[in-house]
Amino acid sequence: MAASDAVLDKLESLKNQINYHNKLYYVLDAPELPDAEYDKLFQELQAIEQQFPELVTEDSPTQRVGAAPLDSFASIEHKRPMLSLDNVFNVEELFAFDKRIRDRINADASLEYSCEPKFDGIAASLLYENGRLKTAATRGDGTVGEDITQNMRTIGSVPLKLEGNNIPAVLEVRGEVYMPKAGFLRINEEALAKNEKTFVNPRNAAAGSLRQLNPQITAKRPLVFCAYNVGVVEGGELPATHYETLTQLFEWGFLVSEERRIAKGIEECEAYYHYLEAKRESLAYDIDGIVFKVNAFDLQERLGFVSRAPRWAIAHKFPAQEALTVLHDVEFQVGRTGAITPVAKLQPIFVGGVTVSNATLHNKDEIERLGIRVGDTVIVRRAGDVIPQIVSIVESKRPQDAREIKFPTACPVCGSDVESVEGEAAIRCTGGLVCEAQRKESIKHFASRQAMDIDGLGDKIVDQLVDNKLVNDVADLYTLDIPTLAGLERLGAKSAANLVAAIEASKQTSLDKILYALGIREVGRATARNLANHFCTLNKVMDATQEQLIEVTDVGPVVAHYVVDFFAQANNREVIEKLIAAGVNWPDIEKVDGVKPLEGTTYVLTGSLESLSRDEAKDKLQALGAKVSGSVSAKTTCVVAGPGAGSKLAKAEKLGLAILDEVGLLALLEEHGV
């Protein structure tokens, strides 16, 4: 039986009423309907949908809860990377940030900033298509996150359908998922009453609740989503400033911070910081600092980005919390490059929202500066509310049996000699790959997402491979088979097969990734990319002199020395030969007469691509010397437009710019051999 017009009208009326009261409750914090009356509306809507299941839509208020539990989280690639923010920890650093960006864009001291609290929660991205929630993802590694769509749908402050006018066809909204202090206390009290494990702090509670495979568990947790930024926007326009955009998001149905402010000049930013720091404890949620963003989007675009963060924003972190505890012992850990680091073993202490039992002591110089001994009472601080460190000792509490900390004269793992290098505070194991610790760390680095991206090769598996002498260097990974891997602890035949497939897939890589994966000291991702683009082949990098290396962007004498030293070692060259013999392949980069073929051009990517991701397309264009921008202007050389291209394509057509579809892009890349 089809639903009558009266039923359809009633259905829409109930949806609108419930959405209205949801906004009052979750976004405005101003409910005007008793819970019992709200429940009646909800039950009435449920009854109609049960009678006419064909009328149930994804954006119905009843669909926030009820999805079936998942076996695991799928991955979602962000259309635009979710970058982190750089931090400052004092006013001097904040003022230096302001001067740096004003000098870059020639702005006066009244530069306008948007100011808002930095929530201590979990970053998430919501993607809306035609005003309806399509997908939701965690930040992940900034490029790929976990699909948490069903869990985010259960959060009352997440609109399933946007309201208002001028909603873009595609809109990505980014924000923080957090658990209010009152909700955190309540769920811990409930857990204690049931003799269940409690959460350490609201952030952990939010993370644990958001990553439940069963959305019905997430639905019972008091989570809140607060929007703080936008990502991809297609088929629509945003206001000209960040602050106005937050206001627009509020009008579309999102919760945004009531504490946001506009500051004219860095002095007003400083005043806002002190204002919110004083108010911090009275807020309903945890914050760990303030975020300042250049307000005007056109200035943000001029400032651009560094490798991992925007130049136009900074997080001013609150002073870390400190606590007293006792140093029980010191252990020495060996890192990938052989650096031997002292780690303090502490009497567990609750500080900064977590229980701390270990802290870094950095190196011998730091231990001497502190004058610290085993048995001392120490002050522990969580620097930036993240990394525990010992900042001082309480000498008056030193016991008579306190003992000096003695650094090892031999590697604590392999027994090799240790060396002190002039100008360095660290001591290093000379064992190289003879040292199991260095072998393990080098293999973990090689397999990491930013390097060879071998999915499933976790730390514990690497430890077993080295301990069982199945792998001696990174090239040995490509000799592993399913029976060998299936014999490892907690790794069955199916997981072993998946891992072998991932290892096989990693054989096709790029020159910059293999340079980074090799683990050359001080060669990070950006330096590896610069080396690749400058020399174009691995052989040329391997044979380069220090003088030639110093000509590369951002490569100084120290890095040049490490690169030369790495390739001077016969065992490293042998590993590279073994990788090539195993079928690992990285194409050379073509460069004509020393000039990259697309140097001086600016490309813009919009819409979706089928044969490669937008990040892959961006990497390939940059490898050819092109600049890849996020917006279209008269200076744009070409716009690459895939399905779903919106306002950027329209603007390109209006400006008469060159436009390529995916076929044209692939032809361009093939022409230049990438």
Swiss-Prot record:
GO molecular function, one term: metal ion binding
Family matches, as PROSITE patterns: BRCT, DNA_LIGASE_N1, DNA_LIGASE_N2
Recorded superkingdom: Bacteria
Domain BRCT: start-end pairs: 593-674
Residues the record lists as binding NAD(+): 35-39, 84-85, 116, 139, 176, 293, 317
Signal peptide start and end residues: none
Catalytic activity: NAD(+) + (deoxyribonucleotide)n-3'-hydroxyl + 5'-phospho-(deoxyribonucleotide)m = (deoxyribonucleotide)n+m + AMP + beta-nicotinamide D-nucleotide
Alphabetized NCBIfam families for the sequence: dnlj, PRK07956.1
HAMAP family hit by this protein: DNA_ligase_A
Function: DNA ligase that catalyzes the formation of phosphodiester linkages between 5'-phosphoryl and 3'-hydroxyl groups in double-stranded DNA using NAD as a coenzyme and as the energy source for the reaction. It is essential for DNA replication and repair of damaged DNA.
Protein name per UniProt: DNA ligase
The species this protein was found in: Saccharophagus degradans (strain 2-40 / ATCC 43961 / DSM 17024)
